[in-house]
UniProtKB/Swiss-Prot annotation:
Matches recorded under Gene3D superfamilies: Helical scaffold and wing domains of SecA, P-loop containing nucleotide triphosphate hydrolases, SecA, preprotein cross-linking domain
Subcellular location: Cell membrane; Cytoplasm
GO CC annotation: cell envelope Sec protein transport complex; cytosol; plasma membrane
Subunit structure: Monomer and homodimer. Part of the essential Sec protein translocation apparatus which comprises SecA, SecYEG and auxiliary proteins SecDF. Other proteins may also be involved.
Organism domain of life: Bacteria
Recorded GO MF terms: ATP binding; protein-exporting ATPase activity
Role this protein plays: Part of the Sec protein translocase complex. Interacts with the SecYEG preprotein conducting channel. Has a central role in coupling the hydrolysis of ATP to the transfer of proteins into and across the cell membrane, serving as an ATP-driven molecular motor driving the stepwise translocation of polypeptide chains across the membrane.
This protein's name: Protein translocase subunit SecA 2
UniProt entry keywords in alphabetical sequence: ATP-binding, Cell membrane, Cytoplasm, Membrane, Nucleotide-binding, Protein transport, Translocase, Translocation, Transport
Source species of the chain: Geobacillus thermodenitrificans (strain NG80-2)
Length: 788
């Protein structure tokens, strides 16, 4: 077995494989022993394992027997036996790494092993799937193993009630989609009572299709937002204005980072249109926001690629799956800018209440693991950002899929003509063909060329997503032609129909190289599952987006040297080297963008952690007076520092304003000063005496239940209000960072520095506002007591 594995993977992982195979051999030796156990004896193993862990043993100590138990139960309950390579996958996951397993190798069954082992620790296991359909399917299938062994299995889906969610999270193992776990985290930090939280502390997660979740979806932050009114008229005016803008004249578009910035000429046009002198004055910050969002909508978002319009509404499309993202909308007025661009009715704008990136959410798990068919190409990113390794797992049966060399054409038209003819040729032989496209627009374009060749097909894209799994599952039937946007239906096995093996299996035809070899490999992986025959080939053109956006000049220079046949197919062998080089450049750029965005979000993440920790203390502490007292002291010190300046003489101080500010905070011990005060020490002494007297009063009142309850409400309201305002300010700061970049300043350093200053200022306001509200609370409570 080991020699077979070596040949399959290569010698770089030989040491790791030897280590895993030694454990697999131990598990295999236990199989006869497990087969002799009764169902009841197998069930009792769970309690035995828990007792061993409680007595000081580690999960590694019980791993071999636990895996052997799960394998035996899977045989009895599901009629499925884990192969040796699946056991290796389970061991990789249990360690907190990524198991790279080919399509069709039974990743779902693999997850049953580490999820059981880690659930025995009693801290909860989260199994993350690509969509709701897979979460339900896997919970119902693999959940049978765990429930047989006495563990509880939960399902976490959108639109569940808080009570249902709490129950799901209390289960030993919880299935669901990653975004919903992230949204629950944000919602838990918006509650006003600790008992309303649904999650418990994080422990261990297994992410299916981990590359899709942590890399592809990482560009889109999770945002909880509410509705707020925006200026409909300004959106329409800005949309009309930028429609007349010219690239490189009025704005600069960076195709690599997908950013746009106004040039000096563009700025002048905006100032002239609105009759203002300086667009960058603080008073025009909101106007700048409307204009830049209109420009983004105009340049960065393409209809039927990034969004579709259905029933007069803009619906976003997931760039990586081609699915419509139901219920999702862009924040900060960008969605409304797209509506204005399309001349649609403007909906209410979303105001951000809470947000977090996918990366920073999953970095909170102490142990993170995952499975995918394609991760090795992004191993450095997984190591740098998440500290996890990618371990390739050999296939159970040798892979016999044939990956044919790319066919590269000069023009898109020539490419699509060739695609249609190739599909027709294979269709006439009865071989099923799966055509992978990168957008809805491209799907529909391919469909037109197939119509011309009178080839019947099924079109699967964001507009027809309802039967996705069924359509993909049928794609391996004889004579079937399926056009699928990107990796739609991922997680659904394509089973070959009768007689298809003899025809060469499923043929996958890619119509464009993706921005990552990993996604190309995902598409190829739809064919040749579990040792089935199959083939793949990409048809690409030098007019494809990848070349236009990232290598326009080099492509134009190269064209003059190229030779083609009568179909427009390029004959030069070095064209393949050029294509690979451009794709690697794009991969590097995309990684840099993700890394840049993560560095920016790390600033927000630190701030979010501070605010959420304070919020949690307010929720969980019984004595909130103890939390307020340091705030009162700090707020009073800052008032003195603001008005009694050491570089001025006391006669120059604004003593009246200082006294007013202090007396709003210090209740029942009014502060007065000589006119003018003797010196700064005199001021500080009097303030300290008054504050300590007031603190003593608060200490006496802290047993008052109503005071503690009202303090909790006031503190949370103030924190949430100013945190939401701060999120808006940070979004505007981030927006302006692009302009600074244009001015050759380091954007990340500036964002860190200015973001910290803004956070510090916000926190000081929070302390002051809570202090003022505390004084008012105390006053109203004493008045109530006096009246009763």
């Amino acid at each position: 077995m080991l020699s077979l594995l070596k040949r399959a993977i290569g010698y770089t992982n030989e040491r790791q494989l030897k280590k895993y195979m030694r454990v697999v051999e131990q598990i295999n030796r236990m199989e006869p022993q497990m087969e002799k156990l009764t169902d009841a004896e197998l069930r009792r193993k769970t309690d035995e394992f828990k007792e061993q862990l409680a007595s000081g043993k580690s999960v590694n100590d019980i791993q071999v027997e636990a895996f052997a138990v799960v394998r035996e139960v899977a045989k009895r309950v599901l009629g499925m036996r884990h192969f040796d390579v699946q056991l290796i996958g389970g061991l990789v996951l249990a360690e907190g790494n990524i198991a790279e397993m080919a399509t069709g190798e039974g990743k779902t069954l693999v997850a049953s092993l580490p999820s059981y082992l880690r659930a025995l620790e009693g801290k909860g296991v989260h199994v993350i799937t690509a969509n709701d359909y897979l979460a339900k399917r896997d919970r119902n299938l693999i959940g049978q193993i765990h429930e047989f062994l006495g563990l509880t299995v939960g399902l976490n889906l959108p639109l569940m009630s808080p009570q249902e969610k709490k129950q799901a999270y209390q289960a030993d193992i919880t299935y669901g989609i990653g975004t919903e776990f992230g949204f629950d985290y944000l919602r838990d930090h918006m509650v006003y009572d600790a008992s309303d939280k649904v999650q418990r502390p994080y422990h261990y997660a297994i992410i299916d299709e981990i590359d899709s979740v942590l890399i592809d979806e990482a560009k889109t932050p999770l945002i909880i937002a509410g509705k707020t009114r925006s200026s409909t008229e300004l959106h329409y005016i800005a949309a009309r204005l930028v429609k007349r803008f010219e690239r490189e004249v009025d704005y600069i578009y960076d195709g690599e980072t997908k950013t746009v910035n106004l040039t000096d000429e563009g700025i002048e046009k905006v100032e002239k249109a609105f009759g203002i002198d300086n667009l960058y004055d603080a008073e025009h910050q909101v106007l700048y926001h409307y204009v830049i969002q209109a420009l983004r909508a105009h340049v960065l978002f393409q209809r039927d690629v990034d969004y579709i319009i259905r029933d007069g509404k803009v619906l976003l499309v997931d760039a990586f799956t081609g699915r419509v993202m139901e219920g999702r909308s862009l924040s900060d007025g960008l969605h409304q800018a797209i509506e204005a661009k399309e001349g649609l009715e403007i909906t209410e704008e979303n105001k951000t209440y809470a947000s977090i990136t996918i990366q920073n959410y999953f970095r909170m798990y102490p142990i993170l693991s995952g499975m995918t068919g394609t991760a090795k190409t992004e191993e450095k990113e997984f190591q740098r950002i998440y500290g996890i390794d990618v371990i390739p797992i050999p296939t159970n049966r040798p892979k016999i899929r044939v990956d044919l060399p790319d066919r590269v054409y000069m023009t898109r038209h020539d490419k699509y003509v060739a695609v249609a003819k190739e599909v027709k040729r294979r269709h006439e032989s009865g071989q099923p063909v799966l055509i992978g496209t990168t957008s809805i627009l491209q799907s529909e374009e391919v469909a037109k060329y197939l119509d011309q060749e009178q080839v019947p097909y099924e079109l699967l894209n964001a507009k027809t997503v309802e039967q996705e799994a069924e359509v993909i599952a049928r794609a391996g039937q004889r004579g079937r032609v399926t056009i699928a946007t990107n990796i739609a239906g991922r997680g659904t096995d394509i089973l070959l129909g009768e007689g298809v093996n003899e025809l060469g299996g499923l043929h996958v035809l890619g119509t464009e190289r993706h921005e990552s070899r990993r996604i190309d490999n995902q598409l190829k992986g739809r064919a040749g599952r579990q040792g089935d025959p199959g083939s793949s080939q990409f048809f690409i053109s030098l007019e494809d987006d990848m070349f236009r956006r990232f290598a326009a000049e080099e492509t134009e220079k190269l064209k003059a040297k190229l030779k083609t046949d009568e179909t427009g197919c390029i004959l030069n062998n070095d064209i393949h080297e050029f294509v690979d080089k451009v794709q690697r450049i794009v991969e590097g750029m995309n990684f840099s963008v993700r890394e840049y965005n993560l560095k920016l979000d790390d600033v927000m993440n630190e701030q979010r952690n501070v605010i959420y920790q304070i919020r949690d203390r307010v929720l969980e502490e019984n004595d909130r007076v103890a939390l307020v007292v340091p705030m009162i002291r700090s707020a009073c010190d800052r008032i003195v520092d603001a008005y009694a300046l050491s570089e001025q003489i006391p006669e120059e101080w604004d003593v009246r304003r200082m006294t007013e500010e202090l007396n709003r905070i210090v209740y029942r011990t009014p502060i007065t000063f000589d006119q003018p005060p003797a010196d700064l020490e005199d001021v500080k002494r009097k303030v300290a005496e008054a504050v300590e007297s007031y603190v003593a009063l608060l200490e006496k009142k802290k047993a008052h239940t109503q005071l503690q309850t009202l303090l909790k409400s006031v503190m949370l309201t103030v924190i949430d209000d100013y945190w939401m305002r701060h999120l808006d300010q940070m979004a505007l700061l981030k927006e302006g960072i692009g302009l600074r970049h244009y001015q050759q300043e380091d954007p990340i350093r500036l964002y860190q520095k200015e973001g910290f200053e803004m956070f510090k200022a916000m926190y000081e306001v929070i302390e002051k506002e809570i202090s003022v509200h505390t004084a008012r609370l105390l006053q109203s409570l004493e008045q109530e007591e006096g009246q009763s």
